[in-house]
Amino acid sequence: MTNSNLRTENHFDYVKITLASPDRVMEWGQRTLPNGQVVGEVTKPETINYRTLKPEMDGLFCEKIFGPSKDWECHCGKYKRVRHRGIVCERCGVEVTESRVRRHRMGFIKLAAPVSHVWYLKGIPSYVAILLDMPLRDVEQIVYFNCYVVLDPGDHKELKYKQLLTEDEWLEIEDEIYAEDSTIENEPMVGIGAEALKQLLEDLDLPDVAEQLREEISSSKGQKRAKLIKRLRVIDNFIATNARPEWMVLDAIPVIPPDLRPMVQLDGGRFATSDLNDLYRRVINRNNRLARLQEILAPEIIVRNEKRMLQEAVDALIDNGRRGRTVVGANNRPLKSLSDIIEGKQGRFRQNLLGKRVDYSGRSVIVVGPKLKMHQCGLPKEMAIELFQPFVIHRLIRQNIVNNIKAAKKLIQRADDEVMQVLQEVIEGHPILLNRAPTLHRLGIQAFEPKLVDGRAIQLHPLVCPAFNADFDGDQMAVHVPLAIESQTEARMLMLASNNILSPATGDPIITPSQDMVLGSYYLTALKPGASVPEFGDQSRTYSGLEDVIHAFEDKRILLHDWVWVRFNGEVEDEDEIEEPIKAELLSDGTRIEQWTYRRDRFDEDGALISRYILTTVGRVVMNYTIIDAVAVA
């Protein structure tokens, strides 16, 4: 789909992160302009011209590579205005287009010598070391030009493939090879630096190595077996992703778009720049110097030193401080590399992609709401009016209370009773989501029915606290409003707090009474030592139903721990040890009375129960009545 602003919409199924091949890196940065010119390679370390304040050509902010700094205007100013769209200026070579292309167009730096990628060399585990089946220390010695490695032992009897040699050892072997009496025809080959590493990785035939490892694993055990499995797993991943091991050594490095590493002018005329520009500048300077040294056929020791410095510059760009000395800028502050921008809490993923601010959300301190039902939460009116504002405006206009959105907003700002009435109608049956960070499991975000409350704190039912791992010592929670009917339905069906009683991890109840609930239940049902037990028939202590006991307690005629006789026709689980009744009496009308310690039953002539009185405390009646009432409502 394309509109007049050249915006394109690409549909894709998934995002896949794999190793990039050298060709892919070049593809990212290389473009062919409409006039057939190929651009993309950054060859100069300059950023902007200090007099004209325009980007330098072929530099880190080059307009030819990355696009124009100003919309529809080329570098030299020959073409201005949108009518020249797509034209490439003959003088400066800049394509006339929007400046926002500088946010996604990349460049590349073609390296004069291969360089190892520090993530794969110095990461934990080191994938390069695992693939080559060499100690990491040895691989580092090769990459940083401390030791030679044997790439091909030739006819030399003492040399082995992948053996390390110091400078002196290799000089001795060279003397031996080129001596007049030498019998070596097939000369051994050695290498040093990332070039040698690349050669070793290219020599790996992954399917063959995987097959050999599987055979070795079947006949080995213990630590050796674990090491072989570790290596096989890495090789299998390379095969599965169609990646080559030598891609871990870079021939070209991508240059990220200039608007992602900006340079801005401050009030005093000075410039503030992203650390990445300094790191890229070091790489380009060293790369250009190395290319020049190679051109003039400089001594090997000087070229080798420059290659090592280039390796260190690329290491600092990718992950500053991972190896060697940390590169610092002004006032001894370490420069932020690409890895520092991506990783950690303040990194691109956690801060900007996963931690985005979202619309229709808010946050506030939580306080206990003991009078709420479990599926309810108290939402401050001030917060609710802001979160549900579009719904309130829609309803105000639909009910002809106001004529337009502007009038509705003015009315909402006054927050009079009419608006509050509409807000109450809007939130009725509209669930909201409450989330407490850190969301460690799925019960860290649950749905509730909002109830409007005064104040500025969110009220939370105490029973849902264990699921959120919340307490009321200053914890904050975020509120989100599901907008679509589908998301509201999903929230109500799947995420409502009263539907999430069991822990998804263990299957045990996660909503269990605690603290004052347990204490209150204990206090209600506790028996007071030494309390007098009334005789059955005592008018002040015998009641015809549970409600009568509660009314008497509310009228303060009886206390919470007083014993009472109360008529109760339900099932009674009696823990009385006496199987026979204490007293049995046959009345003149043929009915029979049986009395136990805590129960008095009356039966008719056929043995059917006529009435039952139980001896209990007022607190236990309150507890029982409350449970029956709650179950009946549910």
From Swiss-Prot:
A GO MF term: DNA-directed RNA polymerase activity
Record: residues binding Mg(2+): 471, 473, 475
Cofactor: Mg(2+); Zn(2+)
InterPro entries named in the record: DNA-dir_RpoC1_gamma, DNA-dir_RpoC_beta_prime, RNA_pol_asu, RNA_pol_N, RNA_pol_Rpb1_1, RNA_pol_Rpb1_3, RNA_pol_Rpb1_3_sf, RNA_pol_Rpb1_clamp_domain
Keywords: DNA-directed RNA polymerase, Magnesium, Metal-binding, Nucleotidyltransferase, Transcription, Transferase, Zinc
Residues that bind Zn(2+): 74, 76, 89, 92
A matching Pfam family: RNA_pol_Rpb1_1
Gene Ontology CC terms: DNA-directed RNA polymerase complex
Leading EC class: transferase
Reaction(s) catalysed by this chain's protein: RNA(n) + a ribonucleoside 5'-triphosphate = RNA(n+1) + diphosphate
Domain of life: Bacteria
GO biological process: DNA-templated transcription
SMART domains, per database record: RPOLA_N (SM00663)
Cofactor comment: Binds 1 Mg(2+) ion per subunit. Binds 1 Zn(2+) ion per subunit.
E.C. number: 2.7.7.6
Subunit structure and binding partners: In cyanobacteria the RNAP catalytic core is composed of 2 alpha, 1 beta, 1 beta', 1 gamma and 1 omega subunit. When a sigma factor is associated with the core the holoenzyme is formed, which can initiate transcription.
Stated family: Belongs to the RNA polymerase beta' chain family. RpoC1 subfamily.
Biological role stated in the UniProt entry: DNA-dependent RNA polymerase catalyzes the transcription of DNA into RNA using the four ribonucleoside triphosphates as substrates.
NCBIfam families documented for this protein: PRK02625.1 (NF002729), rpoC1_cyan (TIGR02387)
PANTHER family assigned to the protein according to its UniProt record, in alphabetical order: DNA-DIRECTED RNA POLYMERASE (PTHR19376), DNA-DIRECTED RNA POLYMERASE SUBUNIT BETA (PTHR19376:SF54)
Protein name: DNA-directed RNA polymerase subunit gamma
Species: Prochlorococcus marinus (strain MIT 9313)
